Amino acid sequence: MADLRTRYLGLELRSPLVASSSPLTGSLDGLRRLEAAGAGAVVLPSLFEEELALEGPGEPRPDAGPGDRAGYGAGPAAYLSLVAQAKAALEIPVVASLNGVSRGGWVRYASRMEQAGADALELNIYYVSSRPGLSASEVEWHYLDVVRAVRRATGIPLAVKLSPYFSSLANMAGPGGRPR
């Protein structure tokens, strides 16, 4: 068999196939199946800070149907447990994913994911300003501020999921592709 080893985020992968967030990456059984099928790494579904009004299980929404209730209110404890279980069960890198809202939330949950054993972290940043006068550079600054804050708080590799709506990714990346 061909040697498909490669590197992603500084991590050695046995193959270039990275299973992105999907229903399969949301369970330990699905993660094991992906590893057995040849995935080189897995990206867990995002933990959404704005959905975490409480640290523990929440009450189901009144409008939720029976199929919606299974994972509702799982909160960060269940997510961090999945990170820890995946790390213990798999031989491939586990990338946790975070969609934060507040600067403190980005840092707090990123640190917890690292402590749970994540090999790397995907920052799923999607910032939509409701302020009409906010300039593009101010929006970019928000993204860079989040990345810098998480970088200072953690020691694992970071990937940043960007919106396709940036007007100048090269400018945002700065000289030589290095963040400003």
Language model region names:
Residues 27-59, 74-95, 99-180:
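Alpha/beta enzyme core
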Residues 1-18, 79-87:
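N-terminal amphipathic alpha-helix/helix-capping segment at the start of soluble metabolic enzymes
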Residues 21-25:
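Glycine-rich phosphate/pyrophosphate-binding beta-alpha loops
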Residues 57-70:
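Active-site gating loops and adjacent loop-to-helix segments of metal-dependent hydrolytic enzymes
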Residues 1, 16-19, 70-72, 135-136:
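Short linear motifs at secondary-structure transitions and domain/linker junctions
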Residues 9-14, 63-66, 91, 128-130:
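A generic short-segment signal for beta-strand/edge and adjacent turn/coil regions
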